[in-house]
Amino acid sequence: MAEEQVLNTHNASILLSAANKSHYPQDDLPEIALAGRSNVGKSSFINTILGRKNLARTSSKPGKTQLLNFFNIDDKLRFVDVPGYGYAKVSKSERAEWGKMIEEYLTSRDNLRAVVSLVDLRHAPSKEDIQMYDFLKYYDIPVIVVATKADKIPRGKWNKHESVVKKALNFDKSDTFIVFSSVERIGIDDSWDAILEQV
């Protein structure tokens, strides 16, 4: 997709929720997956960059997304919201099922163009954040790291926090790193630039 203006980002809707590949949409539209810890702000990220308040439901209860949620954007692109990882109150068997479902999607879906890996800028990445980044690099899946909740940190400390995150991830300089805030609407254009570069 060459130009951002050809995509009406406000023309977006939730398409379907899927537990396995038999439920995936059967076409060749490009897909961007969104992965991150429970409550890292994935739903807020989706709502903010699409300019919609409640398209993706935000929840104060972590672990709410238990299926792959497919969002249709102007019939030209899809976002795929992946279940949040690292939520302790989910049973081991449920976590194993989610892991299997996520791995199947990420490694076998031809439509997948890139993964937006969301991390919390306030904290060093968790073990699961690092595992996800390593997994994507191992399978050579393009990754865009989006560091959320920047509004919770004074701007003068962003660089320091960014350095901590990058060091922990062993961040590849050829990947894109975006500082993001849904509250202050920071990083929206950079996110779209990075996404559209992949599709």
UniProtKB/Swiss-Prot annotation:
InterPro entries: G_ENGB_dom (IPR030393), GTP-bd (IPR006073), GTP-bd_ribosome_bio_YsxC (IPR019987), P-loop_NTPase (IPR027417), Small_GTP-bd (IPR005225)
Swiss-Prot/TrEMBL GO biological process terms: division septum assembly
Entry GO terms, CC: cytosol
Cofactor(s) demanded: Mg(2+)
Name by which UniProt lists this protein: Probable GTP-binding protein EngB
UniProt organism field: Streptococcus pyogenes serotype M18 (strain MGAS8232)
Residue ranges constituting the EngB-type G domain according to the UniProt record: 28-199
Membership in a protein family: Belongs to the TRAFAC class TrmE-Era-EngA-EngB-Septin-like GTPase superfamily. EngB GTPase family.
Binding site for Mg(2+): 43, 65
PROSITE patterns: G_ENGB (PS51706)
